[in-house]
Amino acid sequence: VLVIGAGPSGTIAAAMIKNAGLETMIVEKLKFPRFVIGESLLPRCMEALEEAGLLDAVKAKGFQEKFGAKFVMNNGDVCDFNFSENFTDGYTWTWQVPRAEFDKTLADACESKGIPVHYETEVIDIQIR
């Protein structure tokens, strides 16, 4: 199974495919680490990382733990979210991550599971027969 993109969705998908007993590989058009935004994870991400078998690799990096979020509106109103109030089932915390390092950690963990990651490889055409 070919997975296009080595970001979090691609690496988690590839790890789950491998866990299901299928062969897979990832192609990524850029070289890692690379700049990308989106540092704020949500607790629901933790279950996907755990199911994919990638949670321990991320834990080992020692990223900053995050237990909630605060938003200050233009009018000064404050909106606090405490993840322990269980807006969803499961984890009550997550991490704040530097995305370049986070994505590289996930890709490296996939490679350690035997999933080839081909960097600087761009998909330019697909033919389905």
Language-model regions, residue ranges each:
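Glycine-rich FAD pyrophosphate-binding loop
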Residues: 2, 18-37
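N-terminal FAD cofactor-binding segment of flavoenzymes
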Residues: 34-75
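Anionic group-transfer/hydrolysis microenvironments
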Residues: 30, 41, 100
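Conserved N-terminal helical subregion
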Residues: 65, 72-129
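N-terminal Rossmann-fold NAD(P) dinucleotide-binding loop
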Residues: 10-11
